[in-house]
A protein has these predicted regions:
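Charged alpha-helical initiation segments
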Residues: 1-36, 138
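Short, hydrophobic, well-ordered secondary-structure elements
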Residues: 36-55
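Amphipathic, well-ordered alpha-helical segments in soluble domains
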Residues: 19-26, 49, 118, 122
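Charged, low-complexity interaction regions
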Residues: 32-39, 100-102
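Long, charged low-complexity segments
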Residues: 2-8, 14, 51, 55-138
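Generic low-complexity, intrinsically disordered sequence content enriched
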Residues: 24, 31-33, 42, 115, ...
Length: 138
């Protein structure tokens, strides 16, 4: 009987998938809103949850936050694609909730949708790559 081996524990996997589901639900709610303030708020929440899903898929989100802060202050690892993506999502979240940001509902939703889609692909691929089936010992 094959055994499943995973670099990530079930706790991290379940949180990554949960945050993806919640990001999708918040995005869906944002699409139904008429108020631009609610659209901005729900879109930002959706993007943050999508970002957290990525962080859980790659390990402890607290460590990821620390690595991001180190990369931003010291410049080390700043060219790493995952660090750059998390940094860009942070910027996008801040921009979305900024009262000076005057984009319309459609543009905000496109930004949130693209963030969710990218996060979803990354999380699912990470979970697939970090789990594999190992045969039994004879």
């Amino acid at each position: 009987m094959p055994l499943e081996f995973s670099i990530l524990d079930e706790f991290m996997k379940s949180w990554a998938l949960r945050y993806l589901r919640e990001a999708e639900a918040d995005l869906s709610l944002a699409k139904e809103c008429d108020s631009i303030e609610l659209v901005k708020e729900l879109s930002a929440i959706s993007m943050r949850k999508a970002q957290l899903a990525i962080q859980y898929a790659f390990g402890d989100p607290n460590i990821m936050e620390y690595i991001l802060e180190e990369a931003l202050t010291k410049g080390s690892l700043r060219k790493e694609p995952l660090i750059r993506l998390i940094e860009k999502i942070n910027i996008l979240i801040k921009k979305t909730v900024d009262p000076q940001f005057t984009a319309g509902k459609d543009k905000i939703l496109v930004l949130a949708e693209k963030t969710f889609e990218a996060s979803s692909i990354i999380v699912k691929e990470a979970l697939k790559r970090f789990s594999f089936v190992k045969g039994e010992k004879n």
